[in-house]
Amino acid sequence: MSLFDHKITELKQMIHKKEIKISDLVDESYKRIASVDDKVQAFLQLDEERARAYAKELDEAVDGRSEHGLLFGMPIGVKDNIVTKGLRTTCSSKILENFDPIYDATVVERLQAAEAVTIGKLNMDEFAMGSSTENSAYKATKNPWNLDTVPGGSSGGSAAAVAAGEVPFSLGSDTGGSIRQPASFCGVVGLKPTYGRVSRYGLVAFASSLDQIGPITRTVEDNAFLLQAISGPDKMDSTSANVEVPDFLSSLTGDIKGLKIAVPKEYLGEGVGKEAKESVLAALKVLEDLGATWEEVSLPHSKYALATYYLLSSSEASANLARFDGIRYGYRSDNADNLIDLYKQTRSEGFGNEVKRRIMLGTFALSSGYYDAYYKKAQKVRTLIKKDFEDVFEKYDVIVGPTTPTPAFKIGEKTSDPLTMYANDILTIPVNLAGVPGISVPCGFADGLPLGLQIIGKHFDEGTVYRVAHAFEQATDHHKAKPEL
């Protein structure tokens, strides 16, 4: 049995009872990485020297002081688009190949304040653009359940590392499903918080109105621990919400009697696989047995979500990625004779194909002749999608459906057709457009690959999302399954 099979509360008790040292946890992480990461390919950089030194320092603090952080001694992996001082942050892109940040992201500072131990940086789709982690400039991460399949994306490294037992917890980011989809594919728990719940300061921007950092863990309880540690307003991020952070752990009561669940017919319609539908219906039966009720509803504008998302996110990306020009930091081409050529060559050589595709789409949507027809119209549809959610939440507590239409697909299966790749996010994208919280929890298997149940809540009501997710988790054994590597 791995130490990482224990929850945070159990590990902290073991530390304080002197049954284990924090150094043992860090050892376990690096030994497991050495054992399996050549297969899984989840990590890009390790911070072993600093992590071991910090673990030793924390070991001395067990008796040395009475107050300890919320994540005292817990090893964690961080997605490589979250800046870490003294540890390279590449966004899995050639253009940031040697970028060494001079400051920590707010979430990293909050992890440090909670006394977590950063193990290293995790692979991802380049600039978080992708659904399979095949778009990394460095390596393709594999799904620990079947090494021939993708782990999902863009936080594929974050989900795969937790599923493979390399770290017990990780941070990812979610712009259109990039935490929930890989969590579903890898059989772990992943939450996209309400937009504004967690500071984005130090998160390299893809689409600023959609991006949100969140936790990936083995259990719902651990997920709530991590969100507790990283949430809250931040003066460095004007989009962080000035709202009180509740005690998320107090929501994990197991009691969902009388709770009203909405199931959108669009989430079980055409394009959603038989196994995904069956697993959701089985999950709804579990929730019914626990005292909740459910009804079918409609989110009528969901059918426009995919097109709306790719217009808006690509438009924001084209603006955000304009800063990577070869002048201030990052890769600089040697094949240029003048400034204009330097910009062209640096960006052509430094960005991968998917990033360039989205920059071009965004630039087109924002161009003067097409702005009203594309970008402005997409913003109007986004408002309608948000209104759909608000209407449903007037009557219901949560929305439930599959996280993804199918389990993980084969590596290379969708890379030649971007539209089939994009369609994989069809059930997660509306949550980002509406800015509401959503979690994926394991709910079954298809052909030996995990499936995820998506639970969506009202703005800033992660507590109810956790309550339902935890009740379901405790009534089932799906989260206990582990891949064999």
Curated annotation (Swiss-Prot):
Enzyme active site: 79 (charge relay system), 154 (charge relay system), 178 (acyl-ester intermediate)
Q: Which InterPro entries match?
A: Amidase (IPR000120), Amidase_CS (IPR020556), Amidase_dom (IPR023631), AS_sf (IPR036928), GatA (IPR004412)
Query: In terms of domain of life, where is this protein from?
Result: Bacteria
Q: What reaction does this catalyse?
A: L-glutamyl-tRNA(Gln) + L-glutamine + ATP + H2O = L-glutaminyl-tRNA(Gln) + L-glutamate + ADP + phosphate + H(+)
GO cellular component, alphabetical, reads:
glutamyl-tRNA(Gln) amidotransferase complex
Q: Name one GO molecular function term.
A: ATP binding
Alphabetized, the UniProt keywords read: ATP-binding, Ligase, Nucleotide-binding, Protein biosynthesis
Q: Which Gene3D superfamilies match?
A: Amidase signature (AS) domain
Pfam families the UniProt entry points to:
Amidase
> Family, per the entry?
Belongs to the amidase family. GatA subfamily.
Q: Quaternary state and partners of this protein?
A: Heterotrimer of A, B and C subunits.
Q: What does the function comment of this entry state?
A: Allows the formation of correctly charged Gln-tRNA(Gln) through the transamidation of misacylated Glu-tRNA(Gln) in organisms which lack glutaminyl-tRNA synthetase. The reaction takes place in the presence of glutamine and ATP through an activated gamma-phospho-Glu-tRNA(Gln).
Matches recorded under PANTHER family: GLUTAMYL-TRNA(GLN) AMIDOTRANSFERASE SUBUNIT A, TRANSAMIDASE
- What name appears for this protein in its UniProt entry? Glutamyl-tRNA(Gln) amidotransferase subunit A
Species, as recorded = Bacillus velezensis (strain DSM 23117 / BGSC 10A6 / LMG 26770 / FZB42)
Name of the gene this protein is made from: gatA
